[in-house]
A protein has these predicted regions:
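ASCE P-loop NTPase helicase motor core
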Residues: 47-202
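Conserved helicase motor
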Residues: 73-77, 269, 295-302
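A short beta-strand element within the Helicase C-terminal
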Residues: 84-90, 305-317, 322-332, 358-360
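Helicase C-terminal subdomain and adjacent C-terminal extension
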Residues: 128-182, 283-284, 322-432, 436
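Conserved helicase/translocase motor-coupling segment
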Residues: 199-280
Length: 458
């Protein structure tokens, strides 16, 4: 195998591009500060007073700051209304942005890049908007198009116009207009076992985790099952025992000087509040908050967040179990009583893709008895089982007798008392190819009877 340092090459290219970009941006800012001091003061006052930029002054600002980060509302309130004002406008989390919110940006852009995921949460405000009022306004929009643009109701354009509805996200609308669409398959946040649930149930097993797990599976996935003490919880949808156990585990982490970031995710708002209160009341809360960046979320509020370690508090016990009200009873089949199944599935996808280093599942009821969500826990149980399973001779390259002997030697060695994980046929070439399109697997020379040779990829 040739000497190949992908990370070194990638880092060098990124460093060069970053320096080049910083040089260009810094030179523009310095030029603006040196040659337009009075304009800088005027613009500073305009920004402080939150007034709309004058067209001529905004042109100076655009040249000095070619890259701007702002909210969608800012386009309408401060930036002049003019076509093609920006070369490219990028909208992130587009599934959460309604068409109405995005219009001020669309009108000012030459090109649009829209990033989003329909399998995660959409816009809450538009989903709660009055359908009757929306239909009335939308009818007026279609009538205006038919009248002013002479568009027939059967025209192809009118089919696209149907997507121009406040109840749709800008992601859904742009899908009907875009000339290029691609699925981002590479996952950089967590290990393959951590993202495997979302990849299997939501993305057809297409996600490619870029992090290679170099530690034991127990350090990545952990189950903590509590024997519920039948304690009566004052508030509904709470489990004080789980909250206290999570606090205990976090304090142990602090004692071990493990300062990886931490969050707790739970299906119920009441449990989120209880966990937040228990942590806040503890004497070391300031240390936990600052060192571990601790926060508590519900399945509905964790989108866009990430932490090194995620604790999941499922709340359900033998005495009470309302998981069915928040999570799907089955990932494959819809229950007759489930009216909001799509929202429940989105919760699952969002919540179980927040972790970077470790997922810890804290539950007070046997998985098989849970009213909902059991499939996700069984999935991760299987991931642990598969990782710990000892490979057999059938798992190695059948064309290589030496590999079978090496596997037997490992099984007979002293290292086995440490319960190691053995991964036969680790596809390092496939992994390198997934992170570098220019990578080519090395070739070996294979001799054939009768003389001659043929080159084949390893």
């Amino acid at each position: 195998m040739p000497d190949y340092n992908y990370l070194g090459q990638k880092t060098a290219i990124e460093r060069y591009n970053s320096l080049e970009l910083a040089l260009q941006i810094d030179s523009r800012v310095i030029n603006f500060a040196d040659n337009y001091k009075n304009d800088a003061k005027t613009l500073s006052q305009i920004i402080a007073e939150k007034r709309r930029f004058p067209r001529d002054k905004f042109e100076l600002l655009r040249k000095a700051f070619p890259c701007m980060i702002c909210s969608l509302r800012d386009y309408a309130e401060y930036i002049p209304l003019e076509h093609d004002l920006f070369d490219i406008i990028i909208i992130d989390e587009a599934s959460q942005v309604s068409i109405a919110q995005a219009f001020p940006a669309i009108l000012r852009a030459k090109k649009m890049v829209v990033l989003g995921d329909r399998k995660q949460f959409g816009n809450v405000k538009t989903s709660n908007a009055s359908k009757e009022l929306n239909n009335a306004y939308f009818k007026r929009v279609k009538e205006a198009l038919e009248r002013d643009k002479k568009i027939d109701s059967s025209d192809v354009t009118m089919v696209r116009v149907e997507k121009l509805n406040i109840s749709n996200s800008i992601l859904e609308f742009m899908e009907s207009l875009s000339n290029f669409e691609i699925m981002l398959k590479k996952h950089f946040r967590g290990y393959p076992e951590m993202i495997s649930f979302s990849s299997r149930y939501f993305y057809g097993n297409y996600l490619q985790a870029m992090k290679v797990r170099g530690k034991r599976i127990e350090e990545v996935l952990e189950f903590v099952q509590l024997e519920h003490d039948d304690r009566f919880d004052i508030y509904k949808n709470t489990n004080e025992q789980e909250a206290e156990k999570i606090l205990e585990l976090v304090l142990q982490q602090i004692e071990l000087e493990d300062f990886r970031s931490v969050a707790v995710i739970t299906p119920f708002t009441e449990q989120q509040t209880l966990i937040s209160n228990i942590f806040t009341d503890h004497e070391r809360f300031d240390e936990i908050r600052k060192r571990l960046k601790f926060r508590s979320f519900t399945f509905d509020s964790c989108q866009g967040e990430e932490r090194d370690i995620i604790y999941y508090s499922f709340v359900a016990s033998r005495n009470k179990d309302r998981l069915w009200a928040v999570l799907p009873k089955s990932m494959d089949a819809q229950d007759e009583e489930e009216l909001d199944r799509n929202k429940k599935l989105q919760r699952m996808n969002v919540a179980f893709s927040r972790g970077k280093e470790k997922l810890v599942f804290v539950h007070s009821k046997p998985i098989s008895e849970m009213s909902a969500g059991k499939e996700v826990l069984n999935h991760y149980k299987t991931e642990i089982k598969n990782a710990k399973a000892m490979p057999s001779v059938d798992d190695v390259d059948q064309n290589s007798p030496a590999e079978k002997r090496v596997l037997e030697w490992i099984k007979q060695s002293k290292i086995m008392k440490y319960n190691p994980e053995i991964q036969p046929q680790f596809e390092i070439g496939k992994y390198l190819a997934s992170i570098d399109v220019d990578y080519r697997q090395p070739e070996c020379k294979k001799r054939i009877p009768g003389g001659g040779a043929v080159w084949e990829n390893l």
